[in-house]
Curated annotation (Swiss-Prot):
The gene is E6. Belongs to the papillomaviridae E6 protein family. It comes from the Viruses. A zinc finger (unnamed) spans 42-78, 115-151. Forms homodimers. Interacts with ubiquitin-protein ligase UBE3A/E6-AP; this interaction stimulates UBE3A ubiquitin activity. Interacts with host BAK1. One of its GO terms (molecular function) is DNA binding. Keywords: Activator, DNA-binding, Early protein, Host cytoplasm, Host nucleus, Host-virus interaction, Inhibition of host innate immune response by virus, Metal-binding, Modulation of host cell apoptosis by virus, Transcription, Transcription regulation, Viral immunoevasion, Zinc, Zinc-finger. It is found in: Host cytoplasm; Host nucleus. It comes from Human papillomavirus type 41. It holds the Pfam family E6. Its main location: host cell. GO terms for cellular component: host cell cytoplasm; host cell nucleus. This is Protein E6.
Length: 156
């Protein structure tokens, strides 16, 4: 499961790990390499991430996990499986986006929202679309989730 200390987290695990790169971009800068040259294994299935997996992980604003073997990411397939497992195990509530201010006192546009399918951090234009179409949003493990454009159109 995504947590504050592992793959898919939204922030550094602890103050003791501040010297380690948290993102793929930071790792590339630290190692003075580019995307096509970086090699990371998936934290869950141990396969080497493809260039597309690395790009998707970075664009999703997910953080690297550090272990004895170095940093790991998460491949696209495992990301989707993890998102489904989290929905099943940690789902708290769902509601229409327009009801959110009545429910929690905040608008969707004021919240950090991740994709329910691929865990990507939603951009403001995606949140605006969810609000305009009054789509469902879900609170899963304390994090609000909606569906990103890539998943809406079937690209991910």
């Amino acid at each position: 499961m995504a947590s504050t200390s592992g793959v898919g987290s939204v922030g550094p695990a602890s103050c003791c790990e501040t010297q380690k790169p948290h993102t793929i971009r930071e790792l590339c800068l630290a190692q003075q390499i580019t995307y096509p040259c970086i090699q990371l294994c998936c934290h869950y299935c141990y396969k080497i991430l493809s260039v597309l997996d690395i790009y998707a992980f970075d664009q999703s604003c997910l953080y690297l996990s550090w272990g004895e073997g170095g940093p790991t990411g998460i491949c696209s397939q495992c990301t989707r499986v993890l998102a489904r497992l989290e929905f099943t195990a940690r789902h708290e509530v769902s509601c229409a986006a327009s009801r959110l201010p009545h429910f929690i006192g905040q608008s969707l546009s004021d919240l950090e929202v991740r994709c329910v399918r691929c865990l990507a951090l939603l951009q403001s234009v995606e949140k605006d679309y969810i609000l305009r179409e009054d789509l469902s949003v879900h609170r899963i493990g304390g994090i609000w989730r909606g569906t990103c454009v890539r998943c809406m159109v079937g690209l991910y």
